[in-house]
Amino acid sequence: VHLTAEEKSAVTSLWGKVNVDEVGGEALGRLLVVYPWTQRYFDSFGDLSTPDAVMGNPKVKAHGKKVLNSFSEGLKNLDNLKGTFAKLSELHCDKLHVDPENFKLLGNVLVCVLAHHFGKEFTPQVQAAYQKVVAGVANALAHKYH
């Protein structure tokens, strides 16, 4: 991902304030509610029958945290996202057979959640930088697909 020094600074300074537990669960939960077909990858998560069930599901929250911890690793390696996400790309492609389009959806949902959490601090410039990052991460995760 090609970010200016200003964009990198905006992304990293905001990310330092992110509560990964809270935002991760909310982002994954919203993905599962807004795009219900994504639930098929989470059969083992139990009750996902209503928005409240999804948002309160401890497995959704735990996996959301895991997803954002990986995203944090990506932020530390913006110049090598494909390398950073190579193993996860392989896992999601070969073993889990996740539609790579879902990575883009989750990235966009994450941007919405960050906007919701940070309000005025999430300026259009910050959003533009985050859109570049989530697109880069989605692209890196889709890299191993044939």
Swiss-Prot record:
GO terms for biological process: hydrogen peroxide catabolic process. Keywords: Acetylation, Heme, Iron, Metal-binding, Oxygen transport, Phosphoprotein, S-nitrosylation, Transport. InterPro entries: Globin, Globin-like_sf, Globin/Proto, Hemoglobin_b, Hemoglobin_oxygen_transport. GO terms for molecular function: haptoglobin binding; heme binding; hemoglobin alpha binding; metal ion binding; organic acid binding; oxygen binding; oxygen carrier activity; peroxidase activity. The modification N-acetylvaline is found at residue 1. SUPFAM superfamilies: Globin-like. Heme b binds at residues 63, 92. It comes from the Eukaryota. Red blood cells. The modification N6-acetyllysine is found at residues 59, 82, 144. GO terms for cellular component: blood microparticle; haptoglobin-hemoglobin complex; hemoglobin complex. The modification Phosphoserine is found at residue 44. The modification Phosphothreonine is found at residue 12. The modification S-nitrosocysteine is found at residue 93. Residues 2-146 form the Globin domain. Involved in oxygen transport from the lung to the various peripheral tissues. PANTHER family: HEMOGLOBIN FAMILY MEMBER, HEMOGLOBIN SUBUNIT BETA. Belongs to the globin family. Heterotetramer of two alpha chains and two beta chains. This is Hemoglobin subunit beta. It comes from Meles meles (Eurasian badger).
